[in-house]
Amino acid sequence: MKQRTYIAIDLKSFYASVECRERRLDPLDTNLVVADESRTDKTICLAVTPSLKSYGISGRGRLFEVKQRVKEANAGRQHDAPGRKLEGSSYLFSELQENPSLAIDFIIAPPRMAYYMEYSTRIYQVYMKYVAPEDIIVYSIDEVFMDVTDYLATYKLSPHDLAMKIILDVLTTTGITATAGIGTNLYLCKVAMDIVAKHIPADKNGVRIAELDEMSYRKTLWSHQPLTDFWRVGKGYAKKLEENGMFTMGDVARRSVTDEDLLYKLFGKNAELLIDHAWGWEPCTVEAVKAYKPESNSLGSGQVLHQPYEADKARLVLREMADILSMDLVDRGFVTDQLVVTIGYDIENLTDPKRRGKYHGEVVKDHYGRQIPKHAHGTINLERYTSSTKQIMDAAGELFDRIADKSLLIRRLNITATHVVDEASAPSAKDSYEQLDLFTDYAALEAKRKQEDEELAQEKKVQQAMLTIKKKFGKNAILKGMNLSEGATAKDRNAQIGGHKA
């Protein structure tokens, strides 16, 4: 079988770079963070420029953490400054390097998600100048995989030179630089980009390109730590591995030889993928990814509330989310027969002594290691496959009432429609079987079902009319009474993309 060559490209601090270019600033020389300051200092930073990261700032930290770190860095600069005094400030890294008397400053740019999507589309068009769409996987708004196996001979270029050519074209077209990884499979090009490229010096344009094959992967990364640097190894996986004496991918590979059963006991069928990756193997190709059709589909959404919500207001928000979910189903021609809801509780439930004293349930740790009440999770089955707004909203409200602890403050909500299928292929009530008995008036039951079918058909017409209006005049062209209630979020979220300002 012909050995394949893959390139992964990650646009450097994409959102932040776009904001710099729009201000005619150099992304590599500007201290800038993309964050919605209107949401308070606890808001998550969507992107941070490389120069600002150089002060020890995380790319996905909170805004208050950025401000605190800059404050600490300025305290150090003041201590070292002539006369121990800072005069003036700058957000340009070069000026700060030249003048030790300047205080570090930075720009806070509010997110513009629709604009970033436009930029991403322009960059994808650059990629298509070199590689056909069927050989490209769009992994995220700022990251792609390419199978360039059949293009190297055409361009008479090495994988490194082709990657550089594409990246420089993107740089010329948009002013945004990138990092690339090259590998003999999708996994290797990804970890080459994520891990190896980060540890090599950038060229004058900020470009880093790293290459791996199976043998160089084992030589270079079998001893690398932490495990969470590797693609698809999260904190939970890493913790389990470390508890069993495996601290590196080399440890995992060796254990797969001596005690493979342990890995399957720990991770089930997912152990196969982990073992493959430990050895640098990945059988999946771009072609296979493109051809993949999942056995079951789901459609859902989630949101982090901007402040802790009492249960009644959180229930309102969940009903709004169910309303939007039903309209998404109608728009896509899908139906569902099951909903799943997850409710995440706020840390204040345990930090407030009065609330803490009333809570006697299970306590877990969140992503930051803080104690919070364990989330609530539940499923409700619908009587039939449907995209009815009324049926889905009523079911979501019923499920919320069943699983939510009404005494706790709520911070996160997720709702998912599972068993999603095309409406045309969905089983109907006529296709199902039921046990007959002597005490049911089946004529009345059939009349009721017929009336319900008519009501659902009428509702579908209303839903489709609403979708037409919303697409033409915007999502807020039609609002319901609940959307104007205190605590409702749909109106604001309709003006967002991915939960951030459009």
Predicted regions and their residues:
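Acidic, metal-coordinating catalytic segment for phosphate/diphosphate chemistry
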Residues: 18, 369-502
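DNA-contacting surface of Y-family translesion DNA polymerases
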Residues: 8, 103, 229, 235-410, ...
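A glycine-rich phosphate-binding loop feature that marks nucleotide/adenosyl-phosphate handling sites
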Residues: 184-187, 276-279, 335-347, 409-422, ...
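Short, charged/polar surface micro-motifs in flexible loops or helix N-caps
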Residues: 12-14, 38-42, 345-350, 420-424
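Short clusters of hydrophobic/aromatic residues that line enzyme substrate/ligand-binding pockets
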Residues: 209-212, 227, 299, 380, ...
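Gly/Gly-Pro- and Ser/Thr-rich, intrinsically disordered tail segments characteristic of DNA damage-repair
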Residues: 1-277, 282-286, 443-502
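Short, well-ordered secondary-structure micro-motifs
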Residues: 191-192, 351-354, 425-428
